[in-house]
A protein has these predicted regions:
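Sec-dependent signal peptide recognition
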Residues: 1-8
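Bacterial N-terminal signal peptides
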Residues: 8-14
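N-terminal (or domain-start) structured segment
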Residues: 20-105, 136-141, 149-204, 293, ...
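N-terminal signal peptide c-region/cleavage motif recognized by signal peptidases
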Residues: 16-18
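Secondary-structure end/capping motifs
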Residues: 261-327
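Periplasmic solute-binding protein
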Residues: 90-98, 110-124, 142-151, 264-273, ...
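C-terminal lobe and pocket-closing loops
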Residues: 203-290, 337-351
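A structural signal for short loop-to-beta-strand junctions that line the ligand-binding cleft
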Residues: 80-83, 98-122, 128-134, 253-261
Length: 351
């Protein structure tokens, strides 16, 4: 009898302790980086609407993969744990060895974001050698640059574009973000690449600098790419057609669309384990946060004003539709041979 009472008391304490535990946002970066700052802003505002404390736990690692793997293999089974993922995680899901799988999770909310590319004012895409300081996250950006510099190439195969790329581009890996900015301003590098907020902070209004293009954002309802309302008349496809007299097409373009949308449509996103009993509550709190003018203003000050997506099944279906054997293999080949990235082909993604 006493033993039963004791076990009951222990169980009650355990349940109360679990109920009182803080919600935790897992961020796969060290403090101070872009997604980490976004996660801190989300935590601060989300707890106002969820009615419970929300803390941030940083789990940094190579290419921001270990933290997401930790969530997948262990932490997602805690009912109060939320994963904060970024666009690089989306590209790594396609092209790197990872444990995590978006189709095992419930989407709580995703900001459909963009990336801004700049060049020196008056630089002619059709001539000269361009030096680009690249790195992780550049996969779709530099593919778009290659198409703008090279235009239509033979049968528009990956090999056709690699030939032009090697003739027109000097690709430099291993340069930090601050060094990239300084190198661009000093004329050492020919391309600038930033988040919308960083573009406005570091480049807007600087003499000799020119906003070159953006990728646009996904219109999920119609499953098409539309112009970024924050940067009108800068859509990559429109600029390409203006330069070359026809719309982009071919193998590199299909690989570009694959990595672009897997990066940008989930560039700042929140996930919980599928079947998590708290997911509906957290999702509703995120909806309230989005609709609150004070909270949303603080978030948009960091990211720019971009739409949120909370329909996980529709978003993942749209992204899944881009994964074909051809596009996946071409993305791997381009990343390996143009950038020197250790990308791998993952046939399991076709299932």
């Amino acid at each position: 009898m006493f033993k039963s009472l004791l076990l009951g008391a222990i169980a009650s304490v355990f349940m109360v302790t679990q109920a009182m535990a803080d919600y935790t946002l897992i961020v796969p970066q060290a403090p101070g980086k872009g997604t980490s700052v976004w996660g801190e802003i989300i935590a601060k505002n989300l707890e106002k609407f969820i009615g419970e404390p929300v803390v941030v736990r940083h789990i940094p690692g190579a290419r921001d993969i270990p933290g997401f793997n930790k969530f997948h293999n262990d932490l997602r089974f805690d009912d109060k744990t939320i994963m904060v993922a970024h666009g690089g995680n989306g590209v790594s899901y396609l092209l790197d060895k990872v444990d995590y799988d978006y189709f095992d999770y419930e989407l709580i909310g995703s900001m459909n974001n963009d990336i801004v590319l700049g060049k020196h004012a008056g630089a002619d895409e059709k001539s000269g050698t361009w030096t680009i300081a690249g790195g992780s996250g550049f996969e779709p950006d530099a593919a778009a640059v290659a198409m703008l510099l090279c235009g239509p190439q033979g049968n528009n195969t990956i090999d056709d574009y690699l030939k032009c790329w090697r003739e027109r581009v000097i690709w430099v890996n291993g340069v930090s973000g601050g060094e990239k900015r300084l190198g661009f301003k000093n004329g050492e590098f020919d391309v600038a690449r930033e988040s919308p907020a960083a573009w406005k902070r570091f480049y807007e209004g600087i003499e000799g600098n020119e906003l070159w293009f953006t990728h646009g954002i996904l219109d999920l309802e119609n499953n098409v790419q539309i112009a970024d309302p924050n940067f009108p008349n800068t859509q990559f496809e429109d600029l390409y057609e203006e330069l070359w007299g026809e719309a982009p097409k071919g193998d590199l373009y299909q690989a570009y669309k694959l990595t672009r949308n897997w990066r940008d449509a989930i560039q700042k996103s929140l996930w919980m384990n599928k079947g998590n009993p708290n997911a509906a509550k957290v999702k509703a709190a995120v909806t309230e946060m989005i609709n609150d003018p004070v909270a949303s203003a603080e978030i948009y000050a960091k990211t720019g004003v971009y739409p949120w997506i909370q329909d996980g099944p529709s978003l993942l279906a749209a992204l899944k539709s881009l994964i074909t054997e051809k596009a996946l293999k071409d993305a791997v080949k381009w990343n390996q041979e143009a950038y020197g990235f250790p990308s791998i082909y993952k046939p399991e993604l076709l299932k």
